[in-house]
Design a protein with these regions (language model features):
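Redox cofactor-anchoring modules in respiratory/redox and cofactor-processing assemblies
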Residues: 1-87, 92-100, 104-110
Length: 110
C-alpha cells in the first residue's frame, strides 16, 4: 500500500510496480474522523514497529523532539495504520508531513 493513488484505470503499470490495490468507490470514502481511542490497532499493523497513535499526537502538537525520538523518520508510509484505524484518523497524511519536517530539521544540523 505504499504507492500513489491513481484516479482511473488507464494508468500504465511498469516493471517497478510491485502490486496493485483496487478499491471500490465505497472503500475510497473515508469515514468521519473521531478521537483516538488508543486501541493500538495502528501500532499492531505497523511493519516498522512504530506507534502511529503517538506520532500523530506529537505531530498535531508540533512536538518535533518527540517525533524524532520516536523515529517518525523510519516510517515507510505503507498506509497500514490508516486502514486499521477505527477512528478514521488520517494517520498517514499526518505522519507523512511530520516525517518531512523532522527530516528537514535533521538535515539542517549537519
Amino acid at each position: 500500500m505504499m504507492g500513489k493513488a491513481i484516479a482511473n484505470m488507464d494508468a500504465a503499470t511498469v516493471k517497478g510496480s510491485s502490486s496493485l490495490l483496487y478499491l471500490t468507490a465505497e472503500q475510497t470514502v473515508r469515514g468521519v474522523e473521531s478521537a483516538c481511542i488508543r486501541c493500538g490497532k495502528c501500532a499492531e499493523a505497523c511493519p516498522m514497529g512504530l506507534e502511529p497513535f503517538l506520532l500523530q499526537k506529537y505531530a498535531r502538537n508540533e512536538m518535533m523532539d518527540e517525533l524524532e525520538e520516536n523515529a517518525v523518520q523510519d516510517c515507510i508510509e505503507c498506509g497500514c495504520c490508516l486502514y486499521s484505524c477505527p477512528a478514521n484518523i488520517p494517520l498517514l497524511d499526518i505522519i507523512r508531513i511530520a516525517k518531512g519536517d523532522v527530516i528537514r530539521i535533521i538535515r539542517t544540523r549537519k
